[in-house]
């Protein structure tokens, strides 16, 4: 998943998408 490990804020955005089932 892009963002994680590079930008914690972006990683949080991706985690939110996963939680919403949109990833």
UniProtKB/Swiss-Prot annotation:
4-hydroxyproline PTM positions:
8
| Cross-link 2'-cysteinyl-6'-hydroxytryptophan sulfoxide (Trp-Cys), where in sequence | 2-6
Whose protein is this, by species?
Answer: Amanita phalloides (Death cap)
Question: Domain of life of the organism in this record?
Answer: Eukaryota
Q: Per the record's keyword annotation, is Transcription regulation included, yes or no?
A: no
On modification after translation, the UniProt record reads: Processed by the macrocyclase-peptidase enzyme POPB to yield a toxic cyclic decapeptide. POPB first removes 10 residues from the N-terminus. Conformational trapping of the remaining peptide forces the enzyme to release this intermediate rather than proceed to macrocyclization. The enzyme rebinds the remaining peptide in a different conformation and catalyzes macrocyclization of the N-terminal 8 residues.
This chain belongs to the protein called Alpha-amanitin proprotein
Additional remarks: The typical symptoms of amatoxin poisoning are gastro-intestinal distress beginning 6-12 hours after ingestion, a remission phase lasting 12-24 hours, and progressive loss of liver function culminating in death within 3-5 days. One of the few effective treatments is liver transplantation.
Entry keywords, A to Z: Hydroxylation, Thioether bond, Toxin
Q: Which family does it belong to?
A: Belongs to the MSDIN fungal toxin family.
């Amino acid at each position: 998943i892009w963002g994680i490990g590079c930008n914690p804020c972006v990683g949080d955005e991706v985690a939110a998408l996963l939680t919403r089932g949109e990833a």
